[in-house]
Amino acid sequence: GDSEVPGMWFGPRL
C-alpha cells in the first residue's frame, strides 16, 4: 500500500 511505501503511487490509494 502507499501508506507502507511513501513515494510509490501504484497502490489502491493515491
From Swiss-Prot:
The lineage of its organism: Eukaryota, Metazoa, Ecdysozoa, Arthropoda, Hexapoda. It is found in: Secreted. Keywords: Amidation, Neuropeptide, Secreted. InterPro entries: Pyrokinin_CS. Myoactive. Its main location: secreted. This is Pyrokinin-6. It comes from Eurycotis floridana. One of its GO terms (cellular component) is extracellular region. Expressed in the brain, subesophageal ganglion and in the retrocerebral complex (mainly corpora allata). Belongs to the pyrokinin family. One of its GO terms (biological process) is neuropeptide signaling pathway. GO terms for molecular function: neuropeptide hormone activity. It comes from the Eukaryota. The modification Leucine amide is found at L14.
